[in-house]
Amino acid sequence: MAKLTKRQKAIASKVEAGKVYNFEDAAALLAELSTVKFSESFDVAVNLGVDPRKSDQVVRSATVLPHGTGKTVRVAVFTQGPAAEAALAAGADRVGMDDLAAEMKGGDLNYDVVIASPDAMRVVGQLGQVLGPRGLMPNPKVGTVTPDVATAVKNAKAGQVRYRTDKNGIIHTSVGKVGFEAGKLKENVEALIADLKRIKPASSKGIYVKRVTLSTTMGPGLVIDQSSLNA
């Protein structure tokens, strides 16, 4: 049997198996256990009462977190004319049409979000095999295909997170960084859960938000007592 590392021993000694944690206690413990040399993210996993095999129960959307994620977001926009000027003014890192598509086909994909105006989809449509596997393909369901590209850029830069239920009916997303004030981190999680409840599929029956788990990039996952959240 492999020996536990010092970090693993610390986690094993402080994390109670099967315990449900108050949000503030969970955030504080995870921050305490974060001893790596980089700034870890706080991530949340929400188990939803949906059947992801049914298309009408796939939950896919985007939420602008009130305090962002703490990450610098690079945004590329496919658009032209006045909309291109508006996108640049809103903070887009790169704006273009065929020229931008050529760059991406050539391997320049150093972007976190790709946005497109509807008239640009004739160009973006050629990039499915390039953008799709990376989760960058613009989609109207998450607000990345829109005539109002400037607002989409502002939302992305402000810390908008995008998510989709996986095959087990769970959504995963980052909600902040270790070092965030607990109150701000909590408000981010509450905003996410409120949005999830708002878009609950009509065909979903029974308990919708089954479990909320908070973790750090390299840390354990702690189950959160939902009564400690205002959502």
From Swiss-Prot:
InterPro entries: Ribosom_uL1_bac-type (IPR005878), Ribosomal_uL1 (IPR002143), Ribosomal_uL1-like (IPR023674), Ribosomal_uL1/biogenesis (IPR028364), Ribosomal_uL1_3-a/b-sand (IPR016095), Ribosomal_uL1_CS (IPR023673). One of its GO terms (molecular function) is structural constituent of ribosome. Pfam families: Ribosomal_L1 (PF00687). Keywords: Repressor, Ribonucleoprotein, Ribosomal protein, RNA-binding, rRNA-binding, Translation regulation, tRNA-binding. GO terms for biological process: regulation of translation; translation. CDD domains: Ribosomal_L1. It comes from the Bacteria. Transmembrane segments: none annotated. One of its GO terms (cellular component) is cytosolic large ribosomal subunit. Binds directly to 23S rRNA. The L1 stalk is quite mobile in the ribosome, and is involved in E site tRNA release. Protein L1 is also a translational repressor protein, it controls the translation of the L11 operon by binding to its mRNA. HAMAP family: Ribosomal_uL1_B (MF_01318_B). Belongs to the universal ribosomal protein uL1 family. Part of the 50S ribosomal subunit. This is Large ribosomal subunit protein uL1. The gene is rplA.
